[in-house]
Amino acid sequence: MTVDTNLERQPKQQKLRNAEYYDMQDVMDKLYEESCKGKSFHNLMHLITSENNILLAFRNIKNNKGSMTKGTDGKTITQYKGWSEEQFVKYFQSKFANYHPKSVRRTEIPKVGQPDKMRPLGIPCMDDRIIQQCIIQVLEPICEARFHAHSYGFRPNRSASHAIARAQSLMNVSKLHYVVDVDIKGFFDNVNHGKLLKQMWAMGIRDKSLICIIGKILKSEIEGIGRPDKGTPQGGIISPLLSNIVLNELDWWLSDQWETKSTRYPYTHSHKYEALKKSNLKEFFFVRYADDFKILCRDYKTAKKIFIAVKEWLWERLGLEISPEKSKITNVRKKKTDFLGFALYVTKKGKKYVSKSNISEKAKKTMKTKLKEQIKVIQHDTSPHQVSQLNAMILGMHNYYNTATGCSRDFREINFVVSKSLKHRLRVKTKKAKRNKNSKSPLPEKVLKSRTYQQFYGSYGGKPKVVAGVQIFPIYGCKFVTPRMFTREVNKYTPQGRQLIHKNLSTVHSLIQYLLETKEYGKSVEYNDNRISLMAGQNGKCAVTGETLCIFDMECHHKKPKKLGGTDEYRNLVWLKSDVHKLIHATEEDTIAKYLDILKLDDKALKKVNSLRLSAENLEIVVKAN
């Protein structure tokens, strides 16, 4: 069998399907369960180098948008095109047997929130990326069982909005208004390699061969610099997991001072805190996202003590310094504190304080810059694709920052600035066409009326701006959405947790974001717009099976094929799972039987398939009763 090199990006839950496809889910569940019980793991390499794990790594890597990024050897995922599965597996098993990573390509990207400053990024070669993916697939379930509940960065099913919700809950419910901001100076560049490997050992990862390989990864030569003696290579697949392992010790040290403090008497949750308040212990809670963390305290005195204690602990235990300029104590009743692009504070409401949030000034500046840069691109390449890229940026910004209570006002401010650039740079492109006086539509007759625009932004006033026949999403069109706390039961390594993931994780926005970013070239503007509208209309589900669609497994079908006179109209399109689409067009009996066996359709679904087959001028499928 030839290794598949179909290069598409996948949503989060597709990795669950990949794991099930290669029979690795049960293995991961077992590792998680045993790690929860405190077991140590001495023989992990046989799992890491297993055939199924290597093939799963390839499947996960090839669907990542970075799969076409070259390392120092100039190769991408396409180098494996045409390889058999056996050849591919044996190649990587031999690499593991005597592993020596290639050098890492160094590049620089703008810092988040500081576009004028750059941060280094190390890009491993493709072979090394697959090896790191093999390792992380086995290590992640072990580490997830040991990580603290209130660490949210680079972890499955957790996001920045969960961290924001946690911080605001501590301000609202627990009434903790003194925030300790600790900024670790150059965290990723200063991680102690020896300490990290000892932390992995303490976490139960005790396979010496694996520890040796990770040591080699940490000391991979950086192009033009040499071999590092400290730090984790930013840009590597395994780096986020390693950074969480380093700071997990800090998480539990902080937590054990109050939140998870053990007591002689087995109190219930609420009674335990009441008892602790009567002691001399200091009350505080923390929330962490990667190396960005907040410690929320009851009063300034406690905050000052915690600030000093954390500073000393980081230096003595991890050899890390804090940045004096960026580390501080903030009273959020008087001043805002920045966290993950949000500015958090509290305001008086009656007799109590209520948490509020805005987009931080740094984040607003970054968004203005990015939008203006894309407008410059459109000025030189006025194509529907580039305008859709702008729309994808706007939608992505709205989806991230809509949990800020002041997001509407903030985006109106951004819109005011960016609209000037839009007007001056694209004034010729947005010139109004003549409109039928009898028409009630705010759009010129020659402009395509976008269903996508109507579904997401139709309730907003104002005349839509149109460039290259595509309506630009209104930058000001963002409404507040209450951030939700993370549900601990959601877990990709338990059957019950996976059910919650499939039930609760809405994929519609991620699918639409993907469709906006990946136009089908050679297709009409009408088709590219209607397929996006249709995705929202079908709520991201297959029209036949009702199952949730994913990027790796979905196709847009013309009910009446274009060769038979069909159009790109909304009513002539339908989103289907790939296997359903193949069944509709199948004419050979063996092929039909194959997909019927895969799909196992009920009578209702088969009726829908036959309706679509007849529209495509194919014969109905008749299933004979046994």
Residue ranges and their predicted role:
Residues 524-555, 577-579:
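Short cysteine-rich loop/turn motifs with clustered Cys
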